[in-house]
């Protein structure tokens, strides 16, 4: 069942990427699928409507919950990051005004703390939201990318 739900999310992301003008080859690379599967996604032949409905519910979730859910569906962190980024259009943000520099978020390899400043390595960050849930002051959050 998780594979089916993941297929629904991939289908929604494929359709979004197509609307942005990407080619099937480019979409296939982002969603880690072969081009024939992308063709099925874009034509509406796959997955079933029930699966797409579940994927749409995930898309409507607050990003931090959707991100955790998507990461639970696959062990491929790069795939999960690509899907989350395209599905929600987000990036991780640190609010320096509310941060107490407690270090709770530092279990994540993408974050560093130096002189009371949290650094975010966007290449290392998999948008898993673990740091968001660890932060006691809600200083880490997802925001829309511009």
Swiss-Prot record:
SUPFAM superfamilies: 4Fe-4S ferredoxins. Binds 1 [4Fe-4S] cluster. [4Fe-4S] cluster binds at residues 125, 128, 131, 135. The gene is fwdE. This is Ferredoxin-type protein FwdE. Residues 90-115, 116-145 form the 4Fe-4S ferredoxin-type domain. The keyword Cytoplasm does not apply. Keywords: 4Fe-4S, Iron, Iron-sulfur, Metal-binding, Repeat. It comes from Methanocaldococcus jannaschii (strain ATCC 43067 / DSM 2661 / JAL-1 / JCM 10045 / NBRC 100440). Gene3D superfamilies: 3.30.70.20. The keyword 4Fe-4S applies. One of its GO terms (molecular function) is oxidoreductase activity. Its cofactor is [4Fe-4S] cluster.
């Amino acid at each position: 069942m998780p594979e089916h739900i993941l297929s629904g999310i991939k289908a929604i992301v494929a359709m979004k990427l197509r609307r942005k003008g990407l080619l099937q080859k480019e979409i296939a690379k982002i969603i880690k699928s072969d081009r024939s599967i992308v063709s099925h996604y874009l034509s509406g032949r796959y997955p079933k409507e029930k699966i797409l409905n579940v994927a749409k519910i995930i898309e409507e979730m607050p990003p931090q919950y959707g991100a955790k859910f998507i990461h639970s569906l696959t062990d491929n962190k790069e795939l999960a990051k690509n899907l989350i980024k395209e599905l929600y259009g987000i990036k991780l943000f640190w609010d320096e005004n509310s941060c107490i520099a407690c270090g709770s978020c530092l279990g994540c390899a993408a974050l560093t703390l130096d002189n009371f400043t949290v650094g975010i390595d966007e290449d290392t960050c998999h948008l898993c939201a673990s740091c968001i849930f660890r932060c006691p002051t809600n200083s880490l959050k997802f925001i829309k990318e511009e």
